[in-house]
């Protein structure tokens, strides 16, 4: 698949000028004639690089404030012309072959992300000539090289040096794929932006002129990893990441050691990391099958880990551990000496901790970096034939948001524990019940079809591990439809309940709490998780 083509003439027109002077200089030193436009041509000329303005080559000036620069047959004919087939036509019309196109596009995404961006600003940053040249060159990759990414500049020069100033068909094809990916992403961003400017469908409020959800939903992801298999061994799988993933995520984490992350590893690590981000104090979250099985705070992460592990040592076996502070050697030692673990993730990992974990070479050790903001954007769930798209669940309550609805007022400690286990319940699969005391989970009931059984399971798990439920707080991710969940909690020893409220039978549920001498707190916010 060699079919090398020499590079004799290149057209360069870039918005992002990172590395372009050095690249153009390298091309010129290798005898490549350079065509260019506007600001790119001026920059190259200022740096002493011989350059021909496209307008001089075509005999047609740039016009309309730069809107029309490269849209000319002498440009596109030179790019699209098939070598050996269109040569006579090109010669007849004075069209020179263009062997390489170096283009990146107007910064549309950066423009619309700016505060105060107007529709007029956005429109002026829609590139027309650029995508046209990119697609033309990519279509004719049999003869023409297209370069859209600055990180490919060195690769191109290296191959030219190794291949008598030529590039192979394999390289041209690979660069063409990158070009089509680039224009697809660009057009998708534009469609998304304009698509939010139409009224919402369905539940549209009166006067709502725009929707945050575009008419068509375009997102592009890049394959980061092929996997041995998916959720089950008979399923093929791969891991894709966003073009610009957010800080401190499983997608951006650096793997320090261990086997390749599996499909389930990635899903569970994401659940653990997003949960531990909720806490400012030293915290540890242990996750198994996407559910927290132990969460705790401590004076340091070692204490937090010891307490989180104490919740459910059985389920912690083969789990995922996440911290919100640097992993130190003492904590790493406690983990590897105590239990089998799949993944450990922390914002940073000390050199000493790396050395400790290295003794268990299969343990996947990840460093995700610090986070400064909450995760934003959309949650997407695939259904057969469609997507469910929603805001991420960023909702959380503070002390001032709580409404005590029982006769008994919660104590200061109960309020503190209520806020702690409410944060945990947000990350437990519905129906979710969490028992907690002293900034430590005591029992977790997850994923049951009836809320009362989740409450019973939380109590059973606490009893199995010898943990004292009496005096604990219970959090429920949604309201109690009946009083039976409160009765089950009281039987286990729960003294305070935090829940959204909003049931048709709230009065019965509150009455049950009063009968048992419980404090009951309403948050007014639900945290279903499916």
Swiss-Prot record:
Gene3D superfamilies assigned: 3.40.140.20, Methylglyoxal synthase-like domain
Domain notes: The IMP cyclohydrolase activity resides in the N-terminal region.
PROSITE patterns associated with the record: MGS
Protein name: Bifunctional purine biosynthesis protein PurH
Organism: Vibrio campbellii (strain ATCC BAA-1116)
Entry keywords, A to Z: Hydrolase, Multifunctional enzyme, Purine biosynthesis, Transferase
UniProt GO BP: 'de novo' IMP biosynthetic process
Similarity field: Belongs to the PurH family.
The protein's annotated pathway: Purine metabolism; IMP biosynthesis via de novo pathway; 5-formamido-1-(5-phospho-D-ribosyl)imidazole-4-carboxamide from 5-amino-1-(5-phospho-D-ribosyl)imidazole-4-carboxamide (10-formyl THF route): step 1/1; Purine metabolism; IMP biosynthesis via de novo pathway; IMP from 5-formamido-1-(5-phospho-D-ribosyl)imidazole-4-carboxamide: step 1/1
């Amino acid at each position: 698949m060699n079919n090398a083509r020499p590079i004799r003439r290149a057209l360069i027109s870039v918005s992002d000028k990172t590395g372009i002077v050095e690249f153009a200089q390298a091309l010129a030193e290798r005898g490549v004639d350079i065509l260019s436009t506007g600001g790119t041509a001026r920059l190259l000329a200022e740096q002493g690089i011989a350059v021909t303005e496209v307008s001089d080559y075509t005999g047609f000036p740039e016009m309309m404030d730069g809107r029309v620069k490269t849209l000319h047959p002498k440009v596109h004919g030179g790019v699209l012309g098939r070598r050996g087939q269109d040569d006579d036509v090109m010669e007849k019309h004075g069209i020179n072959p263009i062997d390489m196109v170096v283009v990146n596009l107007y910064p549309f995404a950066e423009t619309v992300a700016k505060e105060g961006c107007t529709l007029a600003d956005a429109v002026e940053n829609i590139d027309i000539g650029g995508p046209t040249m990119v697609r033309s060159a990519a279509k004719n990759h049999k003869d023409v090289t297209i370069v859209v990414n600055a990180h490919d500049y060195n690769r191109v020069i290296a191959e030219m040096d190794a291949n008598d100033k030529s590039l192979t068909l394999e390289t041209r094809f690979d660069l063409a794929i990158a070009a089509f990916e680039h224009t697809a992403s660009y057009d998708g961003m534009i469609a998304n932006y304009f698509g939010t400017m139409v009224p919402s469908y369905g539940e549209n409020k009166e006067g709502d002129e725009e929707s945050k959800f575009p008419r068509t939903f375009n997102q592009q992801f890049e394959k980061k990893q092929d996997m041995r298999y998916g959720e089950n061994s008979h399923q093929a799988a791969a891991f894709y990441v966003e073009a610009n993933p957010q800080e401190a995520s499983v997608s951006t984490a650096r793997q320090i050691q261990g086997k390749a992350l599996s499909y389930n590893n990635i899903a569970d690590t994401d659940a653990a990391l997003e949960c531990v981000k909720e806490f400012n104090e030293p915290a540890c979250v242990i996750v198994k099958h996407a559910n927290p099985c132990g969460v705790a705070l401590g004076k340091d992460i070692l204490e937090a880990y010891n307490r989180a592990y104490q919740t459910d040592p059985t389920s912690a076996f083969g789990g995922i551990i996440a911290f919100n502070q640097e992993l130190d050697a003492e904590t790493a030692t406690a983990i590897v000496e105590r239990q089998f673990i799949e993944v450990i993730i922390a914002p940073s990992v000390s050199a000493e901790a790396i050395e400790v974990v290295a003794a268990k070479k299969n343990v996947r050790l990840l460093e995700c970096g610090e986070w400064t903001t909450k995760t934003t954007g959309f949650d997407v769930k695939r259904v057969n034939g469609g997507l469910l798209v929603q805001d991420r669940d960023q909702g959380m309550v503070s002390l001032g948001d709580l409404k005590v609805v029982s006769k008994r007022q919660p104590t200061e400690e109960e309020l503190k524990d209520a806020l702690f286990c409410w944060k945990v319940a947000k990350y437990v699969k519905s129906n979710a019940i969490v028992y907690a005391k002293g900034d430590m989970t005591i029992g977790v009931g997850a994923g049951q079809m009836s809320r009362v059984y989740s409450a019973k399971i939380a109590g059973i798990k606490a009893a199995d591990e010898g943990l004292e439920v009496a005096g604990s707080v219970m959090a429920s991710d949604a309201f109690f439809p009946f009083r039976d969940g409160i009765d089950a909690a009281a039987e286990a020893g729960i003294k305070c309940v935090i829940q959204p409220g909003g049931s048709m039978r709230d009065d019965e549920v509150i009455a049950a709490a009063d009968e048992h001498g419980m404090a009951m707190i309403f948050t007014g916010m639900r945290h279903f998780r499916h």
